[in-house]
Amino acid sequence: MMDYAGRVREADTYPKLLRLNAREHGSEIALREKDLGLWKPFTWNDYQTRVRNFALGMVELGLARGDVIGIIGDNRPDWVAAEIATHAIGGLSLGLYRDVLDEEAAYLLNYGEAKLVFAEDEEQVDKLLGLADRVPALKHIVYSDARGLRKYDDPRLMSAEQLVEMGRERQQREPALYDRLVDATKGEDVAILCTTSGTTSHPKLAMLAAGRVLRHCAIYLAFDPKGPEDEYVSVLPLP
């Protein structure tokens, strides 16, 4: 049986763990996404490359350690890639439900001083553009689904593929940069801002260190082991 606790000691952040899995299982399937009725596979190498390009693209935009990056949309590979890429540059990820009300989205993004938001599609882009004046720190909006957005010309907008291309170019100029960024991540550093229920007032942002979450996962897996032959279906919203 795998030594889960030892693996977490070796890779105590999500970017480190992804890099380790890509090295050991690069050509194996890590994720699948259903698109037009067909399951599209992504290998661990695909996954790692997407994360690296997102991370270096954000570095190219001037984002750095301590910056808050918002993510809003459905469960999809780009959500996970955006979150791990955020951690890779030392940023803090802030996930929002795709049906979040405008008032709550504005409050949370402003409270977290989010500088960039990954948005799934036109619906989320419209929501963010409508809130822009209330979230002054927001400088960039990256969308994954370009349908309906061709005629949008707001300077804050860019597609996920444009961000990927920026990251790819940065990788060519500095091939060792991404590994240096990942090596600098620490399990005790806050990586995730998780919204509380907000039953009595505005939601608060609970601060989670990635290392603690991964250690919890290791304890769980020690009692209910999982391996390469097991598959999960992502149903509950990712925030």
Annotated model-derived regions:
Residues 17-42, 148-149:
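AMP-dependent adenylate-forming
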Residues 27-29, 158-195, 202, 225-231:
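Conserved pre-ATP/AMP-binding loop-to-beta segment of ANL
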Residues 30-84, 101-106, 159-164, 208-211:
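Conserved AMP-binding/adenylate-forming core of the ANL superfamily
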Residues 51-52, 206-227:
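Conserved structural elements of the adenylate-forming
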Residues 73-76, 97, 235-239:
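Conserved AMP-binding
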